[in-house]
């Protein structure tokens, strides 16, 4: 009887350990690699606003800035973007939660469960994902598109986004041409797409 009890408790502990590790892991199996704000050279936010989680919306943007093809260039674009958003537009930080670089990497903007400045009226209810470049007349690379899709799956698995989320283009929530005509047509085929917030 003692051996059976010890075995039961040991197996229970192993089960809970594996379940906890599975629920808290973040890495290539669960999320795409995310280049942290510190790693791309970003400044700290002036103020941080938090969102409740899980959120129910993802808003897709394009930056209409020059593209980038490697981590050094994309990091430079991120620094320039953050400086413009803070110094010229008066935002507290870079406006997006995450940004997809031309190198197929995800760059941290304000990050998880923090309020961006990407979609007035919807910032506290959505994750803003921007693609570096102008996607009016061409699509982002397959690597960029896959990185964004992987990030959305990651958000769901981490509990940052509901499974029944709505995916919108920036033009669906404000007066803009973002995320560009070609990219907007593309995201209409993605899971969760809707024109109504």
UniProtKB/Swiss-Prot annotation:
Identify the stretch annotated as signal peptide in this record. 1-23
Cysteine pairs bridged by disulfides in the record: 31-154, 68-74
- Tissue expression summary: Localizes to plasma (at protein level).
Q: What is its main location?
A: secreted
Q: Which GO terms describe its cellular component?
A: extracellular region
UniProt KW Transport keyword: no
User: SMART domains from the xrefs?
Assistant: Ami_2, PGRP
State any GO BP term from the record: peptidoglycan catabolic process
Q: Name one GO molecular function term.
A: zinc ion binding
Q: Kindly list the places in or outside the cell where this protein is found, as annotated in its UniProt entry.
A: Secreted
Q: Where is the N-acetylmuramoyl-L-alanine amidase domain?
A: 53-180
- Protein keywords: Disulfide bond, Immunity, Innate immunity, Secreted, Signal
The record's PANTHER family line, in alphabetical order, gives: PEPTIDOGLYCAN RECOGNITION PROTEIN, PEPTIDOGLYCAN-RECOGNITION PROTEIN SA
Give the function comment from the record.
Answer: Peptidoglycan-recognition protein probably involved in innate immunity by binding to peptidoglycans (PGN) of bacteria and activating the prophenoloxidase (proPO) cascade immune response. Binds to 1,3-beta-D-glucan and PGN.
Question: What family is this?
Answer: Belongs to the N-acetylmuramoyl-L-alanine amidase 2 family.
Provide the protein name: Peptidoglycan-recognition protein 1
